[in-house]
Structures are given as C-alpha cells and as structure tokens.
C-alpha cells in the first residue's frame, strides 16, 4: 500500500515539474512576442534605440527565417545581434605560445544557464591586445559557442575575468536590458532557433551570432519584460523547490 502511495507521489511530482517547465516556456513565448506586459503607446519606439547606435539602421526582414513564426508589436523592431551588441570569442589555448600575463579564464564548463560554476578556474597567458578582446566585465552576456549551443548567463560579479575561444562575449553598444536578451536566448534555445536548423547544428559561429535576427522592444519594455519573467520564474522555482 505504501509503495503505491509513494509511486503516486513521485508521478505527481514529475507531472508538476513538467507543468512548471511548460509554463516557463509559455511565459517566454508571451514575452518575446510582446504579450507578457501591457503595450504603452508612450514608450519610445524601439527603432529610435537602434538609430542611436546607427543612424542609417533599417529594420530586418525576417520572412526568410522560417523558424520565426510570431509577430511583434508595432513599436518593436526586427534587428540582429550585431546591430545591438559588440561581440567576440575568447582566446584558444596554445601551450606553444607563453607570451603574456597569466590570468584566470573560464570555459564552457564554467558557464551554465543563468549561473557560473567557479570552483575550478584555469589560467593561461594573455597579451595586452588579447586582454582587451577577451576580458569579461560585470553585465556582459556570455554565450556558449559549442556543446550546449546558446547556453547563456550574465556575468554579475564585481571582478573581471577572461574567456576562452568557445564562449561569445556580448556587450551592448548602448544602454540595454541585457537580461531581456538573456531570456531571448533561452526562448530561442527552447524553440531550436540556435543549435538546431535555425543556425548551425554543430555550433554557433561568430557570423551566425552576428546575423541572428531578434525582436527588440523599447528600452523600458525590455526592463519590464525581464522583471516580469524574473518574478514569474522565481515563483515557479519556489514551487519545484518545495516538492
């Protein structure tokens, strides 16, 4: 009898975990299509944000990107990662080149969804030019190039660190809500828009990343969306933590 009850509890737990996962996916769907928070007609149109970066900016045509099957609000705009971010990968380990200063760096094994595992940190030499290219500062968005392609987290620490060549570092060209774009990558990953047929199966190259088409809301709505997702996800995480 007790075994049956325990089995039923375990089944209910698995069903609830699956429901929470599905709910999170739905929240992201609504967020990325502009349906999670109310549209404010007084918000500055997103195209003005893009024109502050590049006065000659023209919205992207997403019609050729067959996996994107949702519309966006009128005051949003389709752009590319390259329109919004400066980005590059880190340094490849090269034991035959010892030039530079020994510095801590992270690899894809340190980078997980929305967190970092920093118990094991390696070092390698970086020249001055490599430091500028590979340094990660607080607020930078880091993306896995290979392995679990598109896995992402924001570096929120008060100290800098370096990255190796299988991590993309994204840094906004102007003031943006990086957390909105973090959730955008999570949404794209769930829908196989990165790491699947949407881009390259074997990895996310710098070129693929640069040309990745994304929906961009106004700056205010970026923050509103990110804070709403944070709130909903934290409540769902509390439910699963109590199982």
Protein language model regions, located:
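Short coil/turn segments at secondary-structure boundaries
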Residues: 38-44, 61-66, 94-102, 120, ...
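Interdomain signal-transducing alpha-helices
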Residues: 181, 189, 222-225
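Non-catalytic, well-ordered alpha-helical scaffold segments
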Residues: 21-25, 100-103, 140, 178-182
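Low-complexity, Lys/Gly-biased intrinsically disordered segments
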Residues: 77-114, 131, 149, 205
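Short histidine
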Residues: 33-56, 60
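Non-catalytic DNA-recognition/assembly elements of restriction-modification systems
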Residues: 1-31, 35-36, 62-91, 211, ...
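Cytochrome P450 core scaffold surrounding the K-helix E-X-X-R motif
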Residues: 115-119
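A short beta-sheet element
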Residues: 107-108, 124-186, 195-198, 203-205, ...
